[in-house]
Swiss-Prot record:
<feature type="binding site">
    <location>
        <position position="500"/>
    </location>
    <ligand>
        <name>FAD</name>
    </ligand>
</feature>
<dbReference type="InterPro" id="IPR036188">
    <property type="entry name" value="FAD/NAD-bd_sf"/>
</dbReference>
<dbReference type="GO" id="GO:0019285">
    <property type="term" value="P:glycine betaine biosynthetic process from choline"/>
</dbReference>
<feature type="binding site">
    <location>
        <position position="44"/>
    </location>
    <ligand>
        <name>FAD</name>
    </ligand>
</feature>
<feature type="modified residue" description="Tele-8alpha-FAD histidine">
    <location>
        <position position="99"/>
    </location>
</feature>
<feature type="binding site">
    <location>
        <position position="465"/>
    </location>
    <ligand>
        <name>FAD</name>
    </ligand>
</feature>
<keyword id="KW-0285">Flavoprotein</keyword>
<dbReference type="InterPro" id="IPR012132">
    <property type="entry name" value="GMC_OxRdtase"/>
</dbReference>
<comment type="similarity">
    <text>Belongs to the GMC oxidoreductase family.</text>
</comment>
<comment type="subunit">
    <text>Homodimer.</text>
</comment>
<dbReference type="GO" id="GO:0033713">
    <property type="term" value="F:choline:oxygen 1-oxidoreductase activity"/>
</dbReference>
<feature type="binding site">
    <location>
        <begin position="510"/>
        <end position="512"/>
    </location>
    <ligand>
        <name>FAD</name>
    </ligand>
</feature>
<dbReference type="InterPro" id="IPR000172">
    <property type="entry name" value="GMC_OxRdtase_N"/>
</dbReference>
<feature type="binding site">
    <location>
        <position position="71"/>
    </location>
    <ligand>
        <name>FAD</name>
    </ligand>
</feature>
<protein>
    <recommendedName>
        <fullName>Choline oxidase</fullName>
        <ecNumber>1.1.3.17</ecNumber>
    </recommendedName>
</protein>
<keyword id="KW-0346">Stress response</keyword>
<dbReference type="Pfam" id="PF00732">
    <property type="entry name" value="GMC_oxred_N"/>
</dbReference>
Length: 546
């Protein structure tokens, strides 16, 4: 059932409580509720997405930025980046899967294998994770030629039809620039290739968000309770450091209510809000908690550390001909290419948008247009690391988000971005784009040297809105990994995390489908633990009766 007024909830005790109805949280809650013997509550601060066309209709996604469905987090002043930038975080059921452009990728094998081999995240290699991608999807490409794809999962993946003539010309131009057409999500990592994306969208234009895919079908299920408009204030622990529930605040009157979990709580509020809630609950760097007068439950120095993102630049062009008036989601093509030899994954990705993108350029005086296109190079494995910190002990205050863009000592991130600007220009200048590429609006042909391009990037870069890694999983003995490989918060019991914050290293691609996969994996881990406890209890009972 769905409850948007906590006063109408009489029974406030559940077997499992999932805090955050986003990309992973919805998957966790739905999978746990498949067992009719357990009760599951899913708590979301934002509203229900059902009946909200600007959320459900994928081609309207850009309307949601800086809207009432966006937490809209400013970032701290950047020493080497764009301090005006804001991090869009969705405030609605489905989380960022209800707020994004639904670009759908399986993470490359190399990324997942590295999680295990380099960071000690046992059980997260590609061999273990890829069956979860298959389980969650109904993929248009599934069939005898692609047996790795799923055909019965809740999340619908489709191929963007090549209807945009500028996009088709752009892919021809990529080939002329040495970047061939390549199919995505085949199981082979595309190091150098371009094509129209796969997206998680249904045939009628509805986004296949985690809410649409996992929650809409089960809202009326007897053992499932959806609670919206309720913001988590603090996690609750008993004297043995077991997480027994969560204190939530209703948006109407600001009253605090307590929900109790008999078994486990799963925290799934994203790479910015998950470390915030842990720290408000006494789990985090001890010195930082003490600064804010918060009693330390667990000194966990890795909470809020290791913030990673995909920083993004933009090259904008006027179009010589009218651009498309309709699109699946306006950013339909991806381009991958390496900037140096010998890489097993591309260090540069670009998105092609059939729209202008002047969010960060107009304020600096760069010209704009209403008929143009954009190429947005981004750094797939940025080496800069940032932090998320508390602004105060007040749960209502936005956290301090400091991505520290372009601060890696080797200068890798800026080097790749400059190379990306140059590659975007090279592609747009190919003969195949002669009928489309007009004046370069930004950075403009005047910017040619590395120093000029670096100055442009620092002023105008954006984010692909992919923050990860702030509560990473890792080896049990690694004190900078707040989670063990089973997503359990170290130092307490009864608490797991499932969202983008758990990634020990960023993935090369758009991460949203991987975040859903993390939700699937978390549910499996919980069910396995429950099955083990049941088996042990049965054995103990049998021994007692013998």
């Amino acid at each position: 059932m769905h409850i948007d007024n906590i006063e109408n909830l009489s029974d406030r005790e559940f077997d499992y409580i999932v805090v955050g109805g986003g990309s992973a949280g919805a998957a966790v809650a739905a999978r746990l509720s498949e067992d009719p013997a357990v009760s599951v509550a899913l708590v979301e601060a934002g509203p229900d997405d059902r009946g909200v066309p600007e959320v459900l209709q994928l081609d309207r996604w850009m309307e949601l930025l800086e809207s009432g469905y966006d937490w809209d987090y400013p970032i701290e002043p950047q020493e080497n980046g764009n301090s005006f930038m804001r991090h869009a975080r969705a405030k609605v059921m489905g989380g960022c899967s209800s707020h994004n452009s639904c670009i759908a990728f399986w993470a490359p094998r190399e990324d997942l294998d590295e999680w295990e081999a380099k960071y000690g995240a046992t059980g997260w290699n590609a061999e273990a994770a890829w069956p979860l991608y298959k389980r969650l999807e109904t993929n248009e490409d599934a069939g005898p030629d692609a047996p790795h794809h799923g055909d019965s999962g809740p999340v619908h993946l489709m191929n963007v039809p090549p209807k945009d003539p500028t996009g088709v010309a752009l892919l021809d131009a990529c080939e002329q620039a040495g970047i061939p057409r390549a199919k995505f999500n085949t199981g082979t990592t595309v190091v150098n290739g371009a094509n129209f994306f796969q997206i998680n969208r249904r045939a009628d234009g509805t986004r296949s968000s985690s809410s649409v895919s996992y929650i809409h079908p089960i809202v009326e299920q007897e053992n499932f309770t959806l609670l919206t408009g309720l913001r988590a204030r603090q996690l609750v622990f008993d004297a043995d450091r077991r997480c027994t529930g969560v204190d939530i605040v209703d948006s109407a009157f600001g009253h605090t209510h307590r929900l109790t979990a008999r078994n486990e709580v799963v925290l799934s509020t994203g790479a910015i809000d998950t470390p915030k809630l842990l720290m408000l609950s006494g789990i985090g760097p001890a010195a930082h908690l003490a600064e804010h007068g918060i009693e330390v439950l667990v000194d966990s120095p890795g909470v809020g550390e290791h913030l990673q993102d995909h920083p993004e630049g933009v090259v904008q062009f006027e179009a010589k001909q009218p651009m498309v008036a309709e699109s699946t989601q306006w950013w339909e093509i991806g381009i991958f290419t390496p900037t140096e030899d010998g890489l097993d994954r591309p260090d540069l990705m670009m998105h092609y948008g059939s729209v202008p993108f002047d969010m960060n350029t107009l304020r600096h005086g760069y010209p704009t247009t209403e008929n143009g296109f954009s190429l947005t190079p981004n750094v797939t494995h940025a080496r800069s690391r940032g932090t998320v910190r508390l602004r105060s002990r007040d749960f209502r205050d936005k956290p301090m988000v400091d991505p520290r863009y372009f601060t890696d000592p080797e200068g890798h991130d800026m080097r790749v971005m400059v190379a990306g600007i140059r590659k975007a220009r090279e592609i747009a200048a190919q003969p195949a784009m002669a009928e489309w590429t007009g004046r370069e609006l930004s950075p403009g042909v005047e910017a040619q040297t590395d120093e000029e391009l670096q100055d442009y990037i620092r002023k105008t870069h954006n984010t692909v809105y992919h923050p990860v890694g702030t509560v990473r999983m890792g080896a049990v003995e690694d004190e900078m990994s707040p989670l063990d490989p089973e997503l359990r918060v170290k130092g307490v019991t009864g608490l797991r995390v499932a969202d983008a914050s758990v990634m020990p290293e960023h993935v090369t691609v758009n991460p949203n489908i991987t975040v859903m996969m993390i939700g699937e994996r978390c549910a499996d881990l919980i069910r396995s633990a429950r099955a083990g406890e049941t088996t042990t209890a049965d054995a103990e009972l049998s021994a007692a009766l013998a």
